[in-house]
Amino acid sequence: MQAKAILRHTPTSPRKMRLVAGLVRGKQVDLAKAILLNSTKSASRNVMMTLKSAVSNYALINPDERVSDQELFIKAVYVDQGATLKRTLPAPMGRAFRIRKRSNHLTIIVDKVKNPVTK
C-alpha cells in the first residue's frame, strides 16, 4: 500500500525544485535521505521534509507492518507549478519591469520494495 505526502505553495521556482526531485526519483528512502542531506540546494530541505512526511504516512496507513527506510522506495515524485505572484520593479525613464515570484507543489509517493535485494 503506497503513501503520499504533498507540500503546497512552496516559494521556490518549479524549475529549481525539479532539479532536486530528479536526484531522488526511484531511489530507496535511506539512500534518498543521504543524498538530500549532502545536497547544497536550498530546495533539498523541503524535499527532505516531505519525504519524512510520506514515510510517516506509510506507517500510519500500515500500522501492523514494521518497515524500515531500506524497505521503502520513492515510487513517484513530481513538481507542479503553483500560483505566481506578480510584482513590479521600478525601471529607468518611468517604466516598470514585472517580476514573477513563482511557487510550486511537491508530491512524493512511497511504496514498499516488492523484491528486496539481499547482500
UniProtKB/Swiss-Prot annotation:
BP GO annotations: translation
GO CC terms, sorted: cytosolic large ribosomal subunit
The UniProt record lists the keyword Ribosomal protein: yes
Record-linked InterPro entries: Ribosomal_uL22, Ribosomal_uL22_bac/chlpt-type, Ribosomal_uL22_bac/org-type, Ribosomal_uL22_sf
GO molecular function terms listed in the Swiss-Prot or TrEMBL record: rRNA binding; structural constituent of ribosome
Keyword check for Ribonucleoprotein: yes
Keywords: Ribonucleoprotein, Ribosomal protein, RNA-binding, rRNA-binding
Family of the protein in this entry: Belongs to the universal ribosomal protein uL22 family.
Function noted in UniProt: This protein binds specifically to 23S rRNA; its binding is stimulated by other ribosomal proteins, e.g. L4, L17, and L20. It is important during the early stages of 50S assembly. It makes multiple contacts with different domains of the 23S rRNA in the assembled 50S subunit and ribosome.
Subunit structure: Part of the 50S ribosomal subunit.
Name assigned to this protein: Large ribosomal subunit protein uL22
Higher taxonomy: Bacteria, Pseudomonadati, Chlorobiota, Chlorobiia, Chlorobiales
